[in-house]
Amino acid sequence: MTTSLLSPGTPEKSLPDSWRGEIESRLAAGETIESWLEIDLDSRLQFARGLVVATTRRLLAHAPGAGTWESWDYRPGLALDHRDHAGVGTLELVDAQGRLASWRYTLGHNVTALKLLRAFEEQLAS
């Protein structure tokens, strides 16, 4: 029996199998995925795979080339900034002290990045 990790009514296609096992082991009881973005550039703008996930409780990320996952619980003052320049999109997670994380992707993923941003903002506001 397969259990969906996505919230009911989530428009995103299902999470790629290559990430599913890693995400399942990190979700707390009752925590579901609201949106996700498979990124395709590392910090040097070289092609590499990573994943950013907005859940009902937090933002999870596995940066390209990183050996570990990072996690940030939703809290006041946390923001996800979006911008693009010259074919490269950037999402930056920031708080009052500064940048916490940054992820880059080719603009072919921009629509999905905007969905992730919207899900993040909705969860942060709830």
Language-model features: locations:
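Anionic N-terminal interaction surfaces
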Residues: 1-51
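Short, charged, intrinsically disordered terminal tails
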Residues: 5-9, 118, 122-126
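Generic detector of well-ordered alpha-helical segments enriched in charged/polar residues
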Residues: 20-24, 114-121
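Phosphoinositide-binding peripheral membrane targeting modules
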Residues: 39-88
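Short hydrophobic/aromatic-rich beta-strand segments that constitute the beta-sheet cores
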Residues: 59-63, 93, 102
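Short polybasic amphipathic segments
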Residues: 89-95
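Canonical phosphoinositide-binding patch of PH/PH-like domains
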Residues: 95-116
